[in-house]
Amino acid sequence: MEKIIVRGGKRLNGTVRVEGAKNAVLPIIAAALLASDGKNVLSEVPVLSDVYTINEVLRHLNAEVVFENNQVTIDASKELNIEAPFEYVRKMRASVQVMGPLLARNGRARIALPGGCAIGSRPIDQHLKGFEAMGAKVQVGNGFVEAYVEGELKGAKIYLDFPSVGATENIMSAATLAKGTTILENAAKEPEIVDLANFLNAMGAKVRGAGTGTIRIEGVDKLYGANHSIIPDRIEAGTFMVAAAITGGDILIENAVPEHLRSITAKMEEMGVKIIEENEGVRVIGPDKLKAVDIKTMPHPGFPTDMQSQMMALLLQADGTSMITETVFENRFMHVEEFRRMNADIKIEGRSVIMNGPNSLQGAEVAATDLRAAAALILAGLVSEGYTRVTELKHLDRGYVNFHKKLAALGATIERVNEKVEEVKEQEVSDLHA
């Protein structure tokens, strides 16, 4: 078993560059299945385990996929298979994003019910509601969901009960080849939605209104391969913003898009963090003393749920009582118990977490419960006394490229070790950046 060992006490300084956005690239790779003519070439693709997984799903579906030098080339011009099996989908719920493209191309899709992070139930009912509105019949059973349409999908007016990002993406992709116009209301507004729409349009689709609550998709007969560059990862950028703030450091985050970070920036400035927009990205300077604030996660442009656990680590260092309320996913507080192991004064009250600070955190052995919790525990380790050992790194690798190496380059005392060689003594780790 691999672990990340971090010793607290260092201010982080320097420059770090964020990768292409994980939450943008996965639905875009899935949407590449829509192109029945030509190759799609995607650049700025992060080297993540989830990207390898979705690539394997596409290969199983009979697409040709080459991934090298942060570039993915996809040829989906051959006849596609219709089934994405459990062995792939169990690893990552984003695999369900192939359903809309398969349904549009083949008129049929059979997908194992999805896996991924253990964050509540995260149902796909809104996806299926959209497919049914466009004329598909849906059956769920034996661990699979199957959708099929006689003839072709038809444009429809669809209202989402909740602005689900995944449902917006899946329905938008399916509607590109439907007959007629689809109007998707109460759609998600995330930057990743806009990125997918830009890719679809580059392939020849007619998508308008992405980034607003109403998206119009006029169906076309065929889509073609295109070139597209993935937007920068706003969650990775936000994570390094917290790294600067929590250590009282000074970090320039290159390739960050300030407009995508407004809600994060607003809350951090409220805490006393100095944030400067520069041509290269965003510079973050941590204060000597952090102020307590309250945060409520919301769909975009509200505060992103994917930054909740990282901000929790930061608020543990704030002076006073802070509260985070989670409105997007249930059961996304599994990391609270791990923070308690580090001596945090923190408690759960319903859908909220109350923190009293500042906390004198102590290093401990902790387990990542999901992707963002993995990053949050490492961030907490940066300001803990002694050594923090974080396990279950499979979660971290789903969303961060060389996270420990990037932190080390900024001055953190941190190493990733394999348990077999963890006779690497604490002193050796402490000497890493002496």
UniProtKB/Swiss-Prot annotation:
Location(s), subcellular: Cytoplasm
A Pfam family this chain is assigned to: EPSP_synthase
GO function term, MF aspect, one: UDP-N-acetylglucosamine 1-carboxyvinyltransferase activity
EC number(s) given by UniProt: 2.5.1.7
Any one of the GO BP annotations: regulation of cell shape
Nuclease among keywords: no
Broadest EC class assigned to this enzyme: transferase
Active site residues per record: 117
GO-annotated cellular components: cytoplasm
Keywords on record: Cell cycle, Cell division, Cell shape, Cell wall biogenesis/degradation, Cytoplasm, Peptidoglycan synthesis, Pyruvate, Transferase
Pathway: Cell wall biogenesis; peptidoglycan biosynthesis
Chief place where the protein resides: cytoplasm
Amino-acid positions noted as binding UDP-N-acetyl-alpha-D-glucosamine in the UniProt annotation, renumbered to this chain: 93, 122-126, 306, 328
Residue positions where 2-(S-cysteinyl)pyruvic acid O-phosphothioketal is found in the record: 117
Residue sites binding phosphoenolpyruvate per the record: 22-23
Database matches in InterPro entries: Enolpyruvate_Tfrase_dom, Enolpyruvate_Tfrase_sf, MurA_subfamily, RNA3'P_cycl/enolpyr_Trfase_a/b, UDP_GlcNAc_COvinyl_MurA
Catalytic activity: phosphoenolpyruvate + UDP-N-acetyl-alpha-D-glucosamine = UDP-N-acetyl-3-O-(1-carboxyvinyl)-alpha-D-glucosamine + phosphate
Protein role: Cell wall formation. Adds enolpyruvyl to UDP-N-acetylglucosamine.
Similarity comment text for this entry: Belongs to the EPSP synthase family. MurA subfamily.
PANTHER family: UDP-N-ACETYLGLUCOSAMINE 1-CARBOXYVINYLTRANSFERASE (PTHR43783:SF1)
Protein name: UDP-N-acetylglucosamine 1-carboxyvinyltransferase 1
